[in-house]
């Protein structure tokens, strides 16, 4: 009986490995994979406790090396030299996240917030119960989350300044040890709707499995975020693959995990709430377990930039041209790092 189960498991793993290999071939040739092959990567990650993803990360460093060396640069978050960027990348490798000491200027945050207040967002993130686009009302939200459309985000000059900041492409490249591309930008409101966790709004513990094998998300608070207004919560160290304590949780598949199970597996002392004033910036390897804490009162406005290795970031089938009002700083950054903006061609 035991031998039979082992043979069955080996057969399942072999099938998933074939699907994952097919996904990699598709990614190398066209920048995306079909859904079935992509799911094979995800299930293989869960069944191998991250070993398959770790192997793919090593391969990507060979297949897609960094296209340019790091150089010193100026950022809204300060001046960075090469060693400073590498030190931050190393801290992310250790802890899974990093909170920058400096903040985005209030003027930039306020400009984005003003645009977001007058822009319709998509409430709810529930594909089974879609809601019409609506303006977010912080006093009476109809859903726990309102997503601003990505094309509209690129129209906001303040957000363009954030995208143009070289810290994001440089730090992600240093962290990956490989080429880094901008996958997407996001902007959403989170509102208080009773303080109950909403799984569609990512308010229960989970790991991301976005454009494997490695990605890095940058979050910017555009409003003051306190423990009561929905801070990001991360499990320190949970991003490191092949951990024995993660094996049982990952074996459940791509599901939401209770606070109690996370605390038992990783220790309550490693559950970190990231509160901060407007303009706070932090980087997170979201293959680690994380969630957005449901706001108990007030609201949260959050920006997100996601960088990834280019294996599964399509630039042909899902392009989004830069807007006609692209700021000179954004155009200059795109010219300096053309590979990073492959999905975002210049409008003609």
Predicted regions and their residues:
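Conserved double-stranded beta-helix
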Residues: 2-30, 240-348
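Non-heme Fe(II)-dependent double-stranded beta-helix
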Residues: 7-14, 27, 41-94, 101-203
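Histidine-centered catalytic micro-motifs
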Residues: 202-209, 289-292
